[in-house]
Amino acid sequence: MHHNVFTNNPTVPIDVKNRSVSELMDGMLKTGFQGRKLAESVQAWNNMLKEKNTTVFMGLSGAMVPAGMRRIISHMIRERMIDCLVSTGANLFHDCHEALGRKHYVGSHLANDEKLFEQGVDRIYDIFAVEEEFRTADNLIADFAQEIGEITCSSREFMYLLGKELGRRGAAEDSIVVSAYRHNVPIFVPALSDSSIGIGLTIARRRGLKLEIDQIKDVDEITQIVEKSERTGVVYVGGGVPKNFIQQTEVIASILGMDIGGHDYAIQYTSDSPHWGGLSGCTFDEAVSWGKIAPQAKKVQVFVDATIALPIVAHALHEKTHDLKRIAPVFFWDGPEGLAIDYKE
């Protein structure tokens, strides 16, 4: 049989047998296409968690919370599979909605949307929600903002206060926002105004409240995390604003005189394609040209529906890291020199 450098690693067909999710993922490392990429993402994420003094960022876009991914993200926060979350405001609004005891509902993408509108039901592809309940949450956020009073703060600071308030109201720790508050995991929302949280804050503004979310402070704070971390890894669920907000930290640090060399690990689950030129499908190889990803970084991009990938990946990681005593970063925001980071089990 002819062998050369290209034919030293044969594929191994998947056997059907009793095994764990992590064992299935290990087996898929010897298959092909996006199945192998999914397995490689688990391998890379697991290695990233074992890497000493690494700060793991997650960018969360798409309607992941309405689609049922909320407890997966909060589990990853509690178990410190991620150390900093950058999210769309919509995901966090929907998280607050459920934290307050309300629901999203199994629906159909074939439903009559005019009838849904008449009944006050909103549709997110095949998920339904009650518009009146959303508006109640909008006004609750407005009321909460008025309780805070007239301040200027970053979205991280605002989400911390919101998590504290939801916890005070008895929200369970399966909430993303509450878990982040209790476990000192910062949440940044770079497009907070583009969400129902922004609607709530607009209601408060119309009532006369002067509360400003300082988005430039957001940029500064998250860049400080990158600058003061020994190494960094990124995980993107979808792309969009959260992806670029994290990616640009390396460029900003370089412009400010701290050329860190790019993120050391990079994983993405996306259904977008690179040939359209948009960031959501942009490859990590392209990001190397910008200095956002280190040339030697472990890079895995999986072209997949994230609602398929996340449950599989989360269960595999849970099995692999169950006994791992990870050294996770602890953030101290009020020091004399700004942010300080310590690494503790």
Swiss-Prot record:
Residue stretches spanning the membrane: none
Pathway: Protein modification; eIF5A hypusination
Origin: domain of life: Archaea
Broad EC category: transferase
Catalytic residues identified in the record: 292 (nucleophile)
Catalytic reactions of this protein: [eIF5A protein]-L-lysine + spermidine = [eIF5A protein]-deoxyhypusine + propane-1,3-diamine
Entries under Pfam families matching the protein: DS
Annotated family: Belongs to the deoxyhypusine synthase family.
GO molecular function: deoxyhypusine synthase activity
Listed name of the protein: Probable deoxyhypusine synthase 2
Annotated GO biological process: spermidine metabolic process
Gene3D superfamilies: Deoxyhypusine synthase
Keywords: Hypusine biosynthesis, NAD, Transferase
Gene Ontology cellular component annotations, sorted alphabetically: cytoplasm
Function: Catalyzes the NAD-dependent oxidative cleavage of spermidine and the subsequent transfer of the butylamine moiety of spermidine to the epsilon-amino group of a specific lysine residue of the eIF-5A precursor protein to form the intermediate deoxyhypusine residue.
Keyword Transport included in the entry's annotation: no
InterPro entries: Deoxyhypus_synthase_arc (IPR022899), Deoxyhypusine_synthase (IPR002773), Deoxyhypusine_synthase_sf (IPR036982), DHS-like_NAD/FAD-binding_dom (IPR029035)
Cofactor: NAD(+)
Enzyme Commission code: 2.5.1.46
Keyword NAD found: yes
